[in-house]
Amino acid sequence: MILGSLSRAGPLPLLRQPPIMQPPLDLKQILPFPLEPAPTLGLFSNYSTMDPVQKAVLSHTFGGPLLKTKRPVISCNICQIRFNSQSQAEAHYKGNRHARRVKGIEAAKTRGREPGVREPGDPAPPGSTPTNGDGVAPRPVSMENGLGPAPGSPEKQPGSPSPPSIPETGQGVTKGEGGTPAPASLPGGSKEEEEKAKRLLYCALCKVAVNSLSQLEAHNKGTKHKTILEARSGLGPIKAYPRLGPPTPGEPEAPAQDRTFHCEICNVKVNSEVQLKQHISSRRHRDGVAGKPNPLLSRHKKSRGAGELAGTLTFSKELPKSLAGGLLPSPLAVAAVMAAAAGSPLSLRPAPAAPLLQGPPITHPLLHPAPGPIRTAHGPILFSPY
């Protein structure tokens, strides 16, 4: 019984507490390999002293994914174009399209900015009075109310003469933006226009933009530019007239938009400078200047043949003889003609020349035959082989 109990109770502790198994090998802790390159490369103690090639290999092998750098945005704000590289941007900036846009913007700024107008950000020059939106300097309250200025005010001193009053009419005097009347023609206006054209590389007369001063000089020496200048001044074959009639000596010159132009070479009349430029560029005007015939007229003319030309020459040679015969008729010639007509009744009779002196025909002296024998015409002769 005791042995049996011992044998039964023996295996129970083995089932209740499993035996502790000792690992055959000591498992060391696995080293973590993070994705960042700095801790990974920190494993190598001599990384800082390595060769650059080895550093590059280790960085490529153990380093993390390369971060994509954001590409800088390269664009042209004037032309509204975006580029993929700096070389494309430089090529665009050197091109004609960008240059034309820049010149147009500069020309618009120059037109809008006159000498009497200043930009909002520009400082006011010393001694200048502020102006309102209409370009007229504001007057003091005392002047608006009808009262004169103070005795010591700089507006009007006792010894200074008062300027003459000028009626403000919109017909005779044109006021500038600064409030002063603009003169009709300035002596230095042409020089200022030439300097402005050289600065902007733009011909305002022909509406042509160029890329260099040499091209501008070549354009100014060209035929088209000179022809338009002559048309405006009226010195060349193209004359300018006002639309409503001939110009009055006392009236100022009409602007170019209100004038018509007549080309005396081609006998063509146009109503504006745009049509004049088109006509000057046409083949018809160029051929007319070169002295060539008008192709539109010569196209419809038929070439005359050699027979017609010979007949014309013969008629021109016989015309004086027929005129002389009509003026001084000889009896012998008239008798010979009548005899020839009697001998061959089917022969064609020449048309008599029209007499220069209108009146009743004188037939009696002309019908008398001339003295002497008259040779009659022979009859037809037939040739036969037999």
Swiss-Prot record:
- Compositionally biased residues, Basic and acidic residues: 103-121
**Any idea where this protein resides?**
Cytoplasm; Nucleus, Nucleolus; Cell projection, Dendrite
User: Region (Disordered): which ranges?
Assistant: 90-193, 279-309
For the modification Phosphoserine, the affected residues are S185
Which Pfam families does the protein's record reference? zf-met
Q: What does this protein do?
A: RNA-binding protein that affects the localization and the translation of a subset of mRNA. May play a role in adipogenesis through binding to the 3'-UTR of CEBPA mRNA and regulation of its translation. Targets ITPR1 mRNA to dendrites in Purkinje cells, and may regulate its activity-dependent translation. With ELAVL1, binds the 3'-UTR of p53/TP53 mRNAs to control their nuclear export induced by CDKN2A. Hence, may regulate p53/TP53 expression and mediate in part the CDKN2A anti-proliferative activity. May also bind CCNB1 mRNA.
From the Swiss-Prot or TrEMBL record, give the protein name.
Zinc finger protein 385A
Species name for this entry?
Homo sapiens
